[in-house]
Amino acid sequence: QDLVVSSWKERLIAERMHQKAAHIQQLLQQTNRHWEEVFWQLTARNFGLPQNSEVFEAVAKTISVTLLAKHKHQIHQLEALLLGQAGLLEQQFTDEYAVMLQKEYRYLKKKYQLHTIHGTLKFLRMRPSNFPTLRLAQLAMLVHQSSHLFSKVLEAGSVSQIKKMLNVTANDFWHTHYTLTEASPYRAKNLGTSMVNNLLINTIIPLLFEYAAEHGEQRVQQKAIEWLRQLPKENNRITRLWEESHTVHNNAHDSQALLYLKKNYCDAKRCLQCAVGNAILKRT
């Protein structure tokens, strides 16, 4: 049975990568196959987490990597661009930092003839560490501290190299703020291990896998899968259900396979098309 489960997990991961590839290919088409641009848009989407992913991706689509590169050395300008395009610099502010960002944004908006995104960002029922204001500030810092990120991902020899690149800390203002309007007790706002792992699992590894598939680079594909095995298993409601049923999962490769299995086979009642389901039915 372990052999059945093990080989089925490989198949599920392949299906999961194929599912992710559909969105990647759509973005490649929109960007004239610009991999760095797609990497930027998907990274921004991931920073938005499920609640704000659509708005974050829409914001990224209005700010090209070329425009980001022009302002990458000025963290305040990057924050102004991202927060402004997300519609978070529209109100009256009293805090001088927020006023400065608003002024910066108005200048950049006029200069580049930008159009603010009018999606609604969610703050309710979210941990302050996931507030869109803070996540956009961290995203700005990632742009500020790195360049040609996707090229660096392709060149990276280990998953720890990528983790080092990703683990940024937001600008000083954010150490005492989660939003632009309210101060909070001091806490350094670094991206954190779970968010870094989330980015690797949901954006970097699928994009790397798809790039390798398109360019016939099997070694890079294997590297992507190996990185998935090196990441810790995810901890959420569904993975805990699998644990309760004594299904072994040791790393992110396993948990991703099981998450995909639950959504696309168990929930869809496709037991007869599932290797595990078949094995169980044969025993009964």
Predicted regions mapped to residue ranges:
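Hydrophobic, aromatic-lined core segments that form the binding pocket/scaffold
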Residues: L12-S255
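Acidic, carboxylate-rich catalytic segments that either coordinate divalent cations
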Residues: E244-T284
